[in-house]
């Protein structure tokens, strides 16, 4: 619909509005509904009628109220000022809305996503007369002490630089260059549903180091990868996702709270301001973007919050940064889709979800990737996407979980039984998987330890064997097992409790460097190998359980993350010494 054409409301059904006299309107065009000019988006066109999903509360709308066309799609504002911001689902800055209308957002309130009056120190990197193309870097702004915000040519622009400003202070709407007669400003707009272009997709080679042992060591996630964290109520999805956002070794972290509790979002914001990034020594908020679309906000805006996060992530990816986007939770978005679909009277699919659930989820997850960007200088960037799924009753066979599993390449399945046992993170090592292991093996072997893959497979085999022995233990009891199996159960317990369990609220254990994780597993495996040797020499499991080094292994996660190599050397020596003295004692008794 071209700018200026006005339609009328024909029908209102919750967040869904049907307007008439809308001939010429386009799908996914933004409209303003009613006298309060509520933001909406056309999701379907039929004759002269347009089907609109409204991103604000529709209470009080009447048949015959005006609908104003804007002529453009829903677009994200991209430029300096994004980092550290808190937005709602349609990119309204929440701190500014609080100043304007208080704690409760009123209908029809509008605010610019990026400040127009703030001046940024711009440094040009191109000269007059140079040829430039899409996504070429023409300068940069020091947005935070951690993030250098590169100013890029819009993807639809190319030509010769006719004019470029000198170094100085400029707002995001001040012209900084002119290319073929077109003025370039620091602010860009990009439709949220349209993926940003890139030169080529590259193979995943590097892992996203999260500081969580169960993920980094057992089920690694590659940069540019896509993963899902499904889990029932109370299994720790939100805390796990917040941990990943806090400690992941990425340049930018985007946290999208999509239909979850407001208190959880508030908790995340408080902790991000307080915590320090171990890589840079600066506050975590200086590399983060927050999008809060809590459960009491309009359901239709859940979809835009997800796509807004992906668009901002792609923008920073195009600068050559590694970005992690976390969506908590995609199930709430799927529920919003189901509600809109029901009001549209579409044929329902499984459990009432629309038939296009899978393709809509794929359109989000497929925006991830490790890419070579357009433009000069040559650079690579990545967008890694991790989505929580909240299946009712922890039933992983429900449609949203199943549709997600067909798309993602890593699954971190949260287990209700583990959570009830206070085993956190409650990631079930028997169900979870990562298809990125082969991709990141070379990186682990070159940068961390050449024995990583072997250690990982040994540990997983022990945990698998423990699960097989559990049934037998229930029938005959642990004491009836052979000594080797008793040792295996003890080592499996050590892996579970001393390695996989990680305290998100412990000063040291909240984050574990990959090298420390490898040394921890080496300590457990050394205990297992020496234990097998001791059993062959006739030493009972009772004696092995009494060794002092068992207690030291249980406390190794509390070893500080700085200069831990010496502490582990000492631990390995203690384990060897304990077993040597045990074997000597056994030999002495045998001689007598």
From Swiss-Prot:
Q: Which GO terms describe its cellular component?
A: plasma membrane
Q: Know the name of this protein?
A: A-type ATP synthase subunit A
> Does the entry feature the keyword Ion transport, yes or no?
yes
* Assembly with partners or alone: Has multiple subunits with at least A(3), B(3), C, D, E, F, H, I and proteolipid K(x).
- What GO biological process, any one, is recorded here? proton motive force-driven plasma membrane ATP synthesis
Organism in which the protein naturally occurs: Staphylothermus marinus (strain ATCC 43588 / DSM 3639 / JCM 9404 / F1)
Q: How does it sit in the membrane?
A: Peripheral membrane protein
Kindly report the protein's main subcellular placement as a broad class. membrane
């Amino acid at each position: 619909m071209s700018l200026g054409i006005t339609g009328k409301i024909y029908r209102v059904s919750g967040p869904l509005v049907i307007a008439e006299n809308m001939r010429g309107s386009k799908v996914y065009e933004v409209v303003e509904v009613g006298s309060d000019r509520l933001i909406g988006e056309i999701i379907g066109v039929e004759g002269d009628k347009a089907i609109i999903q409204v991103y604000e509360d529709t209470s009080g709308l009447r048949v015959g109220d005006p609908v104003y066309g804007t002529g453009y799609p829903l677009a994200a504002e991209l430029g300096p000022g994004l980092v550290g911001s808190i937005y709602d689902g349609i990119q309204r800055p929440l701190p500014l809305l609080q100043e304007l209308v208080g704690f409760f957002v009123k209908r029809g309130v509008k605010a610019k996503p990026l400040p127009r009056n703030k001046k940024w120190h711009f440094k040009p990197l191109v000269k007059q007369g140079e040829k430039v193309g899409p996504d070429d870097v023409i300068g940069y702004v020091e947005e935070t002490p951690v993030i250098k915000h590169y100013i890029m040519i819009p993807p639809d622009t190319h030509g010769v630089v006719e004019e470029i400003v000198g170094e100085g202070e400029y707002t995001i709407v001040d012209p900084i260059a002119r290319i073929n007669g077109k003025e370039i400003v620091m602010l860009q707009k990009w439709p949220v549903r349209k993926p940003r272009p890139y030169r080529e997709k590259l193979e995943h080679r590097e892992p996203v180091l999260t500081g969580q042992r169960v993920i980094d060591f057992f089920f690694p996630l590659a940069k540019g990868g896509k993963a899902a964290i499904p889990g029932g109520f109370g299994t720790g999805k939100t805390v796990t996702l917040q941990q990943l956002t806090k400690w992941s070794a990425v340049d930018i972290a985007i946290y999208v709270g999509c239909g979850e509790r407001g208190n959880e979002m508030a908790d995340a914001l408080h902790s991000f301001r307080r915590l320090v990034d171990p890589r840079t020594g600066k506050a975590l908020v200086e590399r983060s973007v927050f999008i809060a679309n809590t459960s009491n906000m309009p359901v239709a805006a859940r979809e835009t919050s997800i796509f807004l996060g992906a668009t901002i992530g792609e923008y920073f990816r195009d600068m050559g940064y590694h970005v992690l986007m976390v969506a908590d939770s995609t199930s709430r978005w799927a529920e919003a889709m189901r509600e809109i679909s029901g009001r549209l009277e579409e044929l329902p699919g499984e459990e009432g979800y629309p038939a296009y659930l899978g393709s809509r989820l794929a359109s989000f997850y497929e925006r991830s990737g490790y890419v070579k960007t357009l433009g000069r200088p040559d650079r690579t960037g990545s967008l890694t996407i991790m989505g929580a799924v909240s299946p009712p009753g922890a039933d992983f066979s429900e449609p949203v979980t199943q549709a997600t599993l067909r798309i993602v390449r890593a699954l971190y399945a949260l287990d209700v039984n583990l959570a009830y046992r206070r085993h956190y993170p409650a990631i079930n090592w028997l169900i979870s998987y990562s298809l990125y292991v082969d991709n990141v093996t070379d990186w682990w072997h070159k940068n961390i330890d050449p024995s990583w893959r072997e250690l990982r497979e040994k540990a997983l085999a022990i945990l698998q064997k423990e699960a097989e022995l559990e049934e037998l233990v229930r029938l005959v009891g642990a004491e009836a097992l052979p000594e080797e199996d008793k040792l295996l159960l003890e080592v499996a317990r050590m892996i579970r409790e001393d390695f996989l369990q990680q305290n998100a609220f412990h000063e040291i254990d909240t984050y574990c460097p990959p090298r420390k994780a490898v040394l921890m597993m080496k300590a457990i495996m050394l205990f297992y190998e020496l234990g097998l040797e001791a059993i062959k020499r006739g030493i009972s499991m009772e004696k092995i359980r009494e060794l002092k080094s068992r207690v030291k292994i249980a406390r190794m996660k509390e070893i500080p993350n700085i200069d831990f190599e010496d502490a582990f050397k000492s631990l390995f020596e203690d384990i060897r010494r304990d077993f040597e003295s045990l074997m000597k004692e056994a030999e002495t008794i045998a001689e007598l």
